[in-house]
Amino acid sequence: MYSFFVLASLLGGALASPVLGLRECTRGSAVWCQNVKTAADCGAVQHCLQTVWSKPTVKSLPCDICKDVITAAGNLLKDNATEQEILMYLERTCDWLPKPNMSASCKEIVDSYLPVILDMIKGQMSHPGEVCSALNLCESLQKHLAELNHQKQLESNQIPELDMAEVVAPFMANIPFLLYPQDGSHSKPQPKKANGNVCQDCIQLVTDVQEALRTNSTFVEALVDHAKEECDRLGPGMSDMCKNYINQYSEVAIQMVMHMQPKEICVLAGFCDEVKEMPMKTLVPAEVVSENVIPALGLVEPIKKDPAPAKADIYCEVCEFVVKEVAKLIDNNRTEEEILHALDKVCSKLPTSLAEQCQEVVDTYGSSILSILLDEASPELVCSMLHLCSSRGLPAATVRVMPRKDGGFCEVCKKLVGYLDRNLEKNSTKEQILAALEKGCSFLPDQYRKQCDQFVTEYEPVLIEILVEVMDPSFVCLKIGACPAAHKPLLGAEKCVWGPSYWCQNMESAALCNAVEHCRRHVWN
C-alpha cells in the first residue's frame, strides 16, 4: 500500500508536463527523455531506454520503492494478471492521494500511458531501474553530481544518499488512514479543509496518537500490526513487499511523527490548509527585545533583572553551540558570506525543543558572533560578551595570537575602533562612546587588553571628539597619530578636517580623505 502510494504521488508530479508538439520533438534527447510522457509523445521511448535511462542513478528511497513496485508488477504479469488488475491497483492508489486535483491528474496519467508503462515493464523486467528513471523516480547520478559540482568538490566516488525526511513524509501523512481505514466509495467527497471541524479533529487525533506513543508501548506494536493488516488488502506479492517496508521504516516514521507538530502532519494529509505566512514567534518582554535587536547594547550594563534560570541556561547552551559551529566554519577558511548562509542550517542539528531558541540566537546575534570571532576573540568568551552566559567560572581564554604590526598603538587602535564601528549606532552621543570605550578593551583578545587600556587612557579626549564624527578605523587611527602616516602625504588635508559633510559629497572627496568606507556605511546607504 505504501509503495503504490509513494509511486502514484511521484508519478503525478513527474508526468505533469504538457503534451509536446512536433516542433519541440525536433530538439533531441534533452526534450525526448524528460519522462515517459515526453518520450511517448515524440516516439523515442526505446531510444531513451537505451541511451539515457540506462545510466547509473542516485541511491534513494523513492528509487528503491519504484524498483520493487516495477518488479512486483512484472511478477503479476508473469502470473497472467491482466492489465485491468494492475490499472485497478494504480487507480485505487490515486484515490488515496489527499487532494482531488492530484488524484484526478494521477488517474489521467495512468489511463493515458498505462500501455507504454506496461510495455516498458515487460521489456525491462531484469532492469527495473530503467523504467523508474523514465518515471523520474530514479535520478541520474551524472545530473546529480553536476548540480553539486558548483557547491563543493567531489571527495569520493560513493553514491550520495538523499534526504530521508522528504521521502518518509508520505508514510506519516498516511497515519490517519491507518488508524481509520477509508473503505467507502472512491467517489465520496473530500473532507473539508481548515474552515470546518475536520482540521481540528485531525489535530486532536494526531495529538492523541503522539500522547499514546509516548506513554503506551503496546500502542506502537498495535499500530504497526494494524498497518501490516492493511497490507493484506493489496493481494499476493504486493502484500509481502508492503510488510517488508513497514518492518524497515515504521520505526523511522514513528520517530518523525513524535517530533512533528500535529498541524504539520494534518497539512501533509490534506485535512488542513497550509499556512503561507511565516509563524509568529513567542512574544518576549520589551526590554529583552531591545537588548536582542541592538547587539551594541552588549557594551552597556544589562538590565537588573533575574531571568528564569532554566531559560537563561538554554540560551547559553544554544549560544555556545552556535559559536562552536561558526568557529569550525572559520577554521575551514569559509568566507563571511558562506558562513552566514550556513548559519541558517545550524539549528537543524539540534533537537526540536531547542530549535526555536537556536533560531532566535542566530537571527539576533549571528552577525555579532561572527564579527567577534573574526576579531580573534576567544570562543569561550563570545556568549559572555553578548550577555547570554554568565562570566563566572570561565576557563582561561585560549586565543590565536596574531603577529603585531609596527606603529605603536596602531593595531590595537584599529581593533578597538573597528569593534565600536560595528556595535555603535550612527550618531551615537559622546556619553555612549565614552561608555563603550571604558568597556571596549575587555572585548579584545588577552594580548591586546593591557595595551588597549593604556591607549584609551592616553587618547581618550581626542578619540571621543573624532569618533562622534567618524568611526572608520584606518582614518581615525591615522588622524589621532596612533598609526604612522603613509609615505605620500594626504593631499588636501586642510579640507579633510571639515568632516563627513565634505568627505561624502562625492567619491573624489571620499577617496581624497580616506573616508570611502565610512561614507558607504554611514551616509550613502
From Swiss-Prot:
Residues 18-58, 489-525 form the Saposin A-type domain. Residues 1-16 form the signal peptide. One of its GO terms (biological process) is sphingolipid metabolic process. Keywords: Cleavage on pair of basic residues, Disulfide bond, Glycoprotein, Lipid metabolism, Lysosome, Repeat, Secreted, Signal, Sphingolipid metabolism. It is found in: Lysosome. GO terms for cellular component: extracellular region; extracellular space; late endosome; lysosome; membrane. The keyword Signal applies. This is Prosaposin. Saposin-A and saposin-C stimulate the hydrolysis of glucosylceramide by beta-glucosylceramidase (EC 3.2.1.45) and galactosylceramide by beta-galactosylceramidase (EC 3.2.1.46). Saposin-C apparently acts by combining with the enzyme and acidic lipid to form an activated complex, rather than by solubilizing the substrate. Saposin-B stimulates the hydrolysis of galacto-cerebroside sulfate by arylsulfatase A (EC 3.1.6.8), GM1 gangliosides by beta-galactosidase (EC 3.2.1.23) and globotriaosylceramide by alpha-galactosidase A (EC 3.2.1.22). Saposin-B forms a solubilizing complex with the substrates of the sphingolipid hydrolases. The lysosomal precursor is proteolytically processed to 4 small peptides, which are similar to each other and are sphingolipid hydrolase activator proteins. Its main location: other. Disulfide bonds join 63-138, 66-132, 94-106, 199-272, 202-266, 231-242, 316-389, 319-383, 347-358, 410-483, 413-477, 441-452. Residues 17-59, 143-195, 276-311, 392-405, 488-525 form a propeptide. PROSITE patterns: SAP_A, SAP_B. The keyword Cell membrane does not apply. Residues 59-142, 195-276, 312-393, 406-487 form the Saposin B-type domain. InterPro entries: SAP_A, SapB_1, SapB_2, Saposin, Saposin-like, Saposin_chordata, SaposinB_dom, Sphingo_Act-Surfact_Prot. Saposin-B is a homodimer. Prosaposin exists as a roughly half-half mixture of monomers and disulfide-linked dimers. Monomeric prosaposin interacts (via C-terminus) with sortilin/SORT1, the interaction is required for targeting to lysosomes. Interacts with GRN; facilitates lysosomal delivery of progranulin from the extracellular space and the biosynthetic pathway. It holds the Pfam family SapA. Glycans are attached at residues 80, 101, 216, 333, 427.
